[in-house]
């Protein structure tokens, strides 16, 4: 967490994506092929360097995503782009125009 009182140890390749929720982040990951999530009191800014060092990329102001788990990028009729992940029970992750080229280049 932000005060370094709590740590969660996950293999970076098990992390599918991270989403921001006010003063918290929710980490979505796979454990023994089952989808799990963990809420941590932290900001996206505080996690950014750690995420980038471990292969996650920012795809939206509120999301980091692991390119290893992206199955496809899909553009909706409204023009919104979503990353579909390889675990079907997880939601689609939005990819903003600002980060679309970066995410696309990693696929």
Regions found by a protein language model. Give the residues of each.
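Conserved binding/recognition cores within well-folded domains
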Residues: 1-87
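A short macromolecule-binding patch
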Residues: 38-42, 92-98
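Intrinsically disordered, low-complexity acidic/polar segments
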Residues: 36, 49, 92, 102-104
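Primarily interfacial, aromatic-capped hydrophobic alpha-helices that serve as membrane anchors
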Residues: 97-107
